[in-house]
Amino acid sequence: LSGRAHREHRSARRRTTPHPSRRGRARAVRALSVATTAAALALGGLAGPSAAPAAAATTPYPNLTPTPPMGWNNWSYYGCDISEETVLANARALVSSGLAAKGYDTVTTDDCWMTHSRDADGNLVPDPTRFPHGMAYVGEQLHAMGLKFGIYEDAGTATCGGYPGSYGHMKQDADLFAKWKVDYLKLDGCNVPVPTGQSADDVYHKLYGDMSQALLDTGRPIVYSVSAPAYFEGEKDWHHVISWSAEVGNLWREGADVAMESSSARGKWASIKYNYAYNVPLADLQSPGRWNDPDFLLAGQSRLTGDEIRSQMSLWSVMAAPLISSTDLTKASPEALAVLGNKDVIAVDQDTKGLQGRIVQQGDGYDVLSKPLADGDRAVALFNSSDEARTITTTAAKAGLPAGSSYLLKDLWSKRTTQTTGTIAANVPAHATVLYRVHAGAAHRVQPATAITWTRTGGEGATSTWKVALADNGPTGLTGAQLRINAPEGWRLSTSKVSLGKVRPGGSATATLTAKGPDAKPGTTVTTLTATARYRAGGAGDGSVSGRASIVTEVPYPSLDAAFNNVGVTNEAAPPAEGNYTTGNFDGGGDSYSAQALAAAGVTPGAKVSKDGVTWTFPAAKPGTPNNVELAGQSITLTGSGSKLWFLGAEAGFASGQVKVTYTDGTTSTGSLGFPNWCCTAGTEYGATTVATSDHRNTPTGPANFGTGYKLFGNSVPLTAGKTIRTVTLPDADAIHVFAITVQ
């Protein structure tokens, strides 16, 4: 997961120039030049840090959050499209849905709530259009609902959205927030000047320490969320920044943001996995009352499955992460509200022992996590991060439970309790997590823990052979076990019903079958087979268990054009004109290349585009229609031979991945492919070269960022000389976009 793109998710709305995104933060910190620093200080009339910054505040911040904070924040769903009514409507939904009563009690307004300049006295000014009654009024309304009032600012000269930052105004802003009766401050870290001779670590420490002391000096208890570590993610000083964040604040954002609402389904799931992956190893840097924050919960947003939102809720709770929803709660589905409001899962997160769970077992595509709970139980999560269903098996001993002969497993999603002698196992669908609360002990008339495991034993093409096993992991044997197999329409099974008879405690029974499906379409097709076993378990009565198998079929696309899945170029015309600027989404934030700006650079639909002797044909697709591939491991049919395979593309992030070339003789070769971000980079990252530069881009509200170059790049991977290409398999890296491929 470390190579996944840091996607640009900051909205471009209401901007005239781009600003550093909240993803890829460390790059932005390191790239800030002395000239930029000096210009920012002069322009803002601010006093910058001295050559040797004074020591940061050493008074430890009080423990205002004995359990992880819970609440709602607008950013991931609304971005800058916020208003007083939007915030208060979601607050009312927190109350009416019952989520507030379950702990979601803090409502935070993120970036873009203020005007672009301070008043004559240097105070922040709420945007009179978005917040006509002011921010104090918002706080009053929230408090009247029994909720807490959260607000956003930035430690730099400007927020990530380009609004006034708290740099040079820490005490003034803290006093203003206290006057408004703010209960929670999220302090971001965009646009922090780092003068020559100083380390970014020291500068950030000083600034965040200054705000910490300023908040203390107000006398008002304000929960302090520190974003500094996110700007050092993966850097050598990352852990050190987290360590001092735990001294100056209550919680800290330590890495990339989760995806925005406009992101693709793959982008959202990838961001959940990415944020989980950087957060889960940080348990040693967390302590009760000091929380690692891997960002918002996405339940209620579009394009995520029920399994995916339950996975995020499960993993965040086991990691003792803040539970902060970012969605439109006024329109959230019953399923999303049930996920956010699951009392048993919330109890795992809010457990008073206050410890982050850890990985106790890993395998190909899965993790097992265990979290100690205050009453001696353990929360055990079986996380299937892969794209295929699988049975995950561990033991009570590996999960850290005391030795014993019996354990009770409560599935916190199905609410079913079973009994095991020590094995903890479940068939887990793709992208899903089974979350158990495990108690050392026994109970009468409780169903034994059972699990179904599918094992593929052979087959090719559309035909596969399988062994299906029913395991009894409990103290009670099974009788009359019957197995039923279901397949999608168009599939044929050699058998759909098998009698398994008796299964002894600790034993298993198996069946074999053959499945044959129709020819798959180009791309990746996932077919699910389901086995359901029904049985009687002595005095515990009748029971059942189900398990899935995934059949993944990869069929190459006949051409790159046939794989196009992203609208990267739009017209500058307003809706409802064909191909208008609202129809694109190159970067996950609704932004796209301007067809007119590209045309001015010589790039038009179907045109030949050349650089350094390499020529591509730009897609002939009309603006507003798919014209590039957002990479997801697609396989493309291609023919030709040469020394290099050249790609025309760009990125909405910073990522690279392996291209696999398969030749007609069955051999393969590989090469690494990456492009610079489409904007605001040196243009030579990953060995790429700039092919064309457009003067501006389109945003969801129209053309913007004039004078800023949005580029297309060329890059290549080597080919084996003398061999003919049959297929090209692209990387699984959704930040990378490819418009054309040619052989040289």
Model regions: which residues?
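Carbohydrate-binding surface patches
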Residues: 316-319, 324-326, 362-401
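Secretory targeting and sorting signals
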Residues: 4-6, 13-56
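Glycan-recognition surfaces
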Residues: 169-172, 221-328, 349
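Short beta-strand elements of extracellular/lumenal beta-sandwich folds
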Residues: 376-382, 461-477
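C-terminal beta-strand-rich structural cap/linker in extracellular carbohydrate-active enzymes
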Residues: 420-448
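Short glycine/proline/serine/threonine-rich loop/turn segments at secondary-structure transition edges
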Residues: 519-529
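N-terminal/edge-of-domain interface segments
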Residues: 547-744
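Aromatic-lined carbohydrate-binding/catalytic grooves of carbohydrate-active enzymes
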Residues: 86, 90-200
